[in-house]
């Protein structure tokens, strides 16, 4: 059974909320790709719409939007998700996960694209430390 941590970022106030989802709510994410819109009800944000922006698998490999499917793939990267070059022209072979959410995915990053009537902090709880 799928189990994810969904990191929902609110672009208006800059806060990020981490929500653990499993069961039927987690199944709403299976098969979706980065860039897809998802109903916020899966994470407790009724009336909201979320866009999937990234994620990582059980080994910490990042999901890349330019790699198809759910499998891992070795790519030669000159920068972007999974590798930050330190000198001009530097390239590196890295292993990344495809753009589709699967059972191997452990974290999903999402941002709010459409707002509901209630405030995000009221729905998810404001965890001030």
UniProtKB/Swiss-Prot annotation:
One of its GO terms (cellular component) is ribosome. Residues 53-88 are annotated as: Disordered. InterPro entries: Ribosomal_eS6 (IPR001377), Ribosomal_eS6_arc (IPR020924), Ribosomal_eS6_CS (IPR018282). Pfam families: Ribosomal_S6e. GO terms for biological process: translation. The keyword Transport does not apply. One of its GO terms (molecular function) is structural constituent of ribosome. The keyword Ribonucleoprotein applies. Keywords: Ribonucleoprotein, Ribosomal protein. HAMAP family: Ribosomal_eS6 (MF_00512). PANTHER family: 40S RIBOSOMAL PROTEIN S6. Belongs to the eukaryotic ribosomal protein eS6 family. This is Small ribosomal subunit protein eS6. It comes from Haloarcula marismortui (strain ATCC 43049 / DSM 3752 / JCM 8966 / VKM B-1809). The lineage of its organism: Archaea, Methanobacteriati, Methanobacteriota, Stenosarchaea group, Halobacteria.
């Amino acid at each position: 059974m799928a189990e994810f941590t969904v990191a929902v970022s609110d672009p208006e106030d800059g806060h990020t909320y981490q929500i653990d989802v499993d069961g039927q709510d987690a199944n709403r994410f299976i098969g979706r790709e980065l860039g897809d819109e998802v109903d916020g009800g899966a994470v407790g944000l009724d009336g909201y719409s979320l866009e999937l922006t990234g994620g990582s698998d059980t080994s910490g490999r990042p999901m890349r939007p330019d790699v198809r499917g759910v499998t891992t793939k070795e790519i030669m990267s000159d920068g972007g998700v999974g590798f930050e070059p330190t000198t001009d022209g530097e390239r590196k072979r890295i292993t990344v996960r495809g753009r589709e959410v699967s059972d191997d995915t452990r974290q999903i990053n999402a941002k709010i694209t459409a707002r509901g009537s209630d405030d995000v902090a009221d729905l998810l709880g404001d965890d001030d430390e």
